[in-house]
From Swiss-Prot:
Keywords: Cytochrome c-type biogenesis, Membrane, Thylakoid, Transmembrane, Transmembrane helix
Entries under InterPro entries matching the protein: Cyt_c_assembly (IPR002541), Cyt_c_biogenesis_CcsA (IPR017562), Cyt_c_biogenesis_CcsA/CcmC (IPR045062)
Natural source organism: Nostoc punctiforme (strain ATCC 29133 / PCC 73102)
Function according to Swiss-Prot or TrEMBL: Required during biogenesis of c-type cytochromes (cytochrome c6 and cytochrome f) at the step of heme attachment.
Gene giving rise to this polypeptide: ccsA
Protein name as annotated: Cytochrome c biogenesis protein CcsA
Coiled-coil intervals: none
Amino acid sequence: MNLVVLQNWLDNASFAILFLTMLVYWGGAAFPNLPYLAALGTAGMAIANLCMATLLGARWIEAGYFPLSNLYESLFFLTWGITTVHLIAESSSRSRLVGVVTAPVAMLIAAFATMTLPSQMQASEPLVPALKSNWLMMHVSVMMLSYSALMVGALLAIAFLIVTRGQNIQLQGSSVGTGGYRSNGYRLHKAAELISQPPAPSAENNGFARFESSSNGNGNANTAVLNLVTTSEPQTVASAEPLSPQRLSLAETLDNISYRIIGLGFPLLTIGIIAGGVWANEAWGSYWSWDPKETWALITWLVFAAYLHARITRGWQGRRPAILAATGFVVVWICYLGVNLLGKGLHSYGWFF
């Protein structure tokens, strides 16, 4: 079997399947009453994942080394990682919205690798002496998996911002996302359903105003209690359209899964950076040389370290950590692709410069 022809067929097939899968997920979001679309989307992601795994395996057999030595191989490894993390996230959340945001990103990466890169960058070449090391598999694969996880987690955070329309949704629970989201507008909306007569304030403490309304019948007392969070912008609270319970439930799921996936990607990033330092010391005699790639890897680590610190230690929930994660999405792309293509250093692919 001609492995080069097989690889060419598989990379085009991966792109085509991801494109169709993206359309299926978007169609499922537009027509939620068609349940079979969700199953088709999951099947499409799984088939694309298998195609890319086969492509990377064929490249490994052909070249004789782990397929992460050039941009073409790393792009498909990244796409494979994104589809893998997607399948995990979708299985955990059981939400179609995961595919709505991850499928187009995976498709665009595959399209870039297949249709944009020059043919000489797609061909396998003998490894340079510095890359002939077991650290190639250890360092680069872990870094790429961390990028995949962090990107998917950040995409879900962006989806959270879209679902909540940027409103300051408050999570009543732990930072992991076990509580329920309730915006001020939603609390007002639910209070209108529970309270049949104008309530009178009974207490106020630490920025929370408690309102109670009681009605007695047959010796039973029904009490409706509404907690109103005092904000500096009451006009925004009053004018914000209340989110439906379905949106709130979806937002809770997205935030929870986003947090967990970023929590998976961050230790992978840490291990990858440490492995890279050890490899650099063996190859070049220095653990850290402030190469542009190393600098941006550190920036990426700091951004997501701040995200996890804010959630775990500072108790940030909802919109603020989602914005920080969305910023991390851009930083990951700069670290992975921007530095490699535009920068000059030991990690540059040298396409533009």
